[in-house]
């Protein structure tokens, strides 16, 4: 049966079969949804901004459902949102939250050089889009890809490090598809870079906390803060003080994450892969 971590017991064949059936059903439903929205491109509203939010939210939620079922099928114990020691895990992740919150152009919004032009329903659906992307990408790239890579080889801190590099590189490279929608080459390269870094940071948090929901929250907040003004407003996002603060914070948290990673003992990950509490 399924425990609080969302993981099936890893041995009984019957449970595996149930998860296999569930996975096939969810995949079939998700495939239909993706076909309807990505190929059919339905117009749910004449407002192009809202229509984009609707489409992204529905398709990413469908994709997330597939990968959450697969996490259960694999038996990875990362889905308990209040897994003990929760408060210690939250404390460990605080520097990462500082990074993602700093992605919001706080100073430009405060001094008026940036401002929002949309609110209300637009803001609600923008939040929904950010959450759906966080759910989908964290389930796929941390909950499945990273944990599958790490499961095969995790005898040392070096193994844990290279698992993160491999999974984060794939996560970054997948953004090359944005070139197909006429995104600028420079913009895509920049997106690959910060996707690699945010992926690596979330990977360390997952290793240390065994809590995928913290990764989802980090990812969603990062996307929300970074895209708020471009999506729902206008103005200058980067000013000199913001750049200086961002660089200092990025360097400090990078050092923190590297030290944290190499202090993680490989056996700590046993609680993700088996029934160790």
Model-derived segments and their meaning:
Residues 3-16, 81-86, 116-120, 167-172, ...:
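Hydrophobic, membrane-facing alpha-helical anchors
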Residues 43-56, 71-140, 144-156, 236, ...:
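Juxtamembrane helix-loop-helix connectors linking adjacent transmembrane helices
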Residues 36-46, 103-113, 176-183, 228-233:
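Juxtamembrane "helix-exit" motif on the non-cytosolic side of transmembrane helices
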Residues 1-79, 224-277:
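N-terminal, membrane-interfacial amphipathic/helix-forming hydrophobic leader that caps
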Residues 18-26, 52-60, 88-92, 122-126, ...:
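Residue-level signature of transmembrane alpha-helical entry/exit and packing/kink sites
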Residues 126-276:
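Transmembrane helix-loop-helix hairpins at the membrane interface
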Residues 62-63, 102, 174:
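Membrane-embedded alpha-helical transmembrane segments of multi-pass integral membrane proteins
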């Amino acid at each position: 049966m399924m425990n609080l971590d969302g993981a099936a017991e890893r041995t009984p064949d019957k449970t595996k079969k149930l998860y296999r059936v569930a996975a096939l059903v969810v995949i079939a439903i998700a495939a239909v949804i993706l076909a309807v929205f990505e190929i059919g491109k339905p117009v749910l509203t004449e407002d192009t901004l809202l229509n984009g939010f609707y489409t992204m939210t529905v398709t990413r939620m469908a994709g997330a459902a597939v990968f959450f079922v697969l996490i259960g099928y694999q038996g990875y114990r990362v889905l308990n949102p209040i897994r003990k020691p929760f408060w210690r895990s939250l404390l460990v992740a605080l520097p990462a939250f500082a990074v993602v919150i700093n992605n919001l152009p706080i100073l430009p919004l405060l001094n008026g050089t940036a401002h929002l032009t949309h609110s209300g329903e637009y803001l609600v659906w923008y939040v929904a889009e950010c959450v759906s992307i966080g759910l989908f990408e964290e389930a796929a790239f941390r909950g499945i890809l990273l944990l599958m890579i790490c499961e095969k080889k995790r005898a040392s801190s070096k193994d844990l490090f290279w698992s993160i590099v491999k999974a984060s590189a794939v996560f970054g490279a997948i953004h090359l598809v944005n070139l197909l929608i006429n995104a600028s080459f420079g913009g895509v390269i920049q997106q690959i870079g910060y996707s690699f870094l945010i992926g690596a940071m979330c990977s360390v948090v997952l290793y240390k906390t065994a809590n995928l929901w913290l990764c989802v929250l980090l990812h969603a907040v990062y996307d929300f803060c970074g895209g708020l003004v471009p999506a729902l407003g206008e103005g200058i996002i980067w000013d000199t003080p913001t750049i200086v603060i961002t660089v200092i914070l990025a360097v400090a948290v990078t050092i923190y994450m590297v030290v944290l990673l190499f202090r993680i003992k490989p056996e700590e990950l046993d609680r993700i892969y088996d029934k160790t509490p």
